[in-house]
A protein has these predicted regions:
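Membrane-proximal interfacial segments on either side of biological membranes
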Residues: 1-280
Length: 280
């Protein structure tokens, strides 16, 4: 279970019901860490709190807050919990919406380890919205309900240690054909102590690899997507199971080309104020 209770384990249960004169409130405690405080009006729950190892206040009317702290967790364990509250929130008789406010010391996501994570999850009709902060990144993840839409990852900050980037680039076996379709953006990207800039693109996997469509940004003085009346800037990454190939096409605006040299630790042999490069 996500809250560290295993099947067959016994824990003390205390429940208090409040009437004034109608049923107004349910207080409960399971063990030392799990606390519930649910409020009612005319026998219908209006708002409340479910808290695990967190000191938080009961939210306003219309919200059920599920707050918890864990050192780490397996995210798959939370799928039934989210589905349970999602189904309840869609009931025509429900007047509250669930909000998950979770904190973790670390999480292993794909090949990355994130630390000091705080996430707030809100369930909407069309998507699950996750706002989060961590040691490496802050931002918002939008997971659409329908399969026809793609997830969106929008970061205000992405700070990668240079050693981590070198490690990931050097990994073998990365297959772009298995990438998940997503719309991605980052407002402030840094690697080590260097600011790289901002970048946004639409990632779409293909049979032969992956495409990065509609690239827009300001990256070391390079500005793909600057010329809105011209074709989009796109990057193609191919993989046939043995070898890789790549291709960048489209126009890229240039501010100061010297910033590119500096960012790549190359001697600054040229400067510019504006310009344009066309990749084909």
């Amino acid at each position: 279970a996500p809250l560290t209770k295993v099947a067959g384990e016994s824990r003390a249960l205390d429940v208090t019901l409040h009437f004034d004169p109608d049923f107004q409130r349910l207080e409960g405690r399971i063990g030392d860490q799990l606390v519930t405080d649910l409020r009612f009006n005319q026998s219908q729950m209006t708002h409340g709190l479910v808290s695990f190892d967190r000191s938080v206040s009961v939210p306003e009317v219309g919200e059920l807050l599920v707050a918890g702290y864990l050192p780490t967790t397996d995210l798959d364990l939370w799928n039934p919990v989210v589905a349970l509250f999602s189904g309840a929130s869609e009931s025509k008789a429900t007047v509250w919406q669930p909000v998950f406010d979770l904190q973790f010391d670390y999480l292993n996501l794909a090949t990355f380890k994130l630390e000091n994570i705080a996430a707030q999850i809100r369930l909407a009709e069309q998507a699950t919205n996750i706002a989060f902060t961590s040691d490496l990144a802050d931002g918002k993840l939008v997971l659409p309900i329908g399969s026809s839409l793609v997830p969106g990852l929008h970061l205000t900050r992405l700070a990668l240690p240079s050693t981590l980037l070198e490690e990931k680039i050097g990994q073998k076996g990365m297959d772009p054909r298995t990438f998940i379709a997503a719309d991605f953006s980052v407002e402030q990207l840094s690697v080590g102590d260097k600011e790289w800039g901002a970048l946004a693109f639409e990632l779409r996997p293909e049979v032969s690899g992956a495409t990065f469509n509609n690239i827009v940004g300001d990256f070391f003085g390079l500005r793909p997507g600057l010329f809105t009346k011209e074709p989009d800037t796109e990057f193609f990454w191919r993989y046939d199971g043995e070898s890789y190939s790549s291709r960048l096409i489209g126009p890229v605006g240039v501010d100061n080309i010297g910033d590119l040299f500096t960012g790549l630790n190359i001697p600054r042999v040229a400067d510019s104020q504006s310009g344009k490069m066309l990749f084909d």
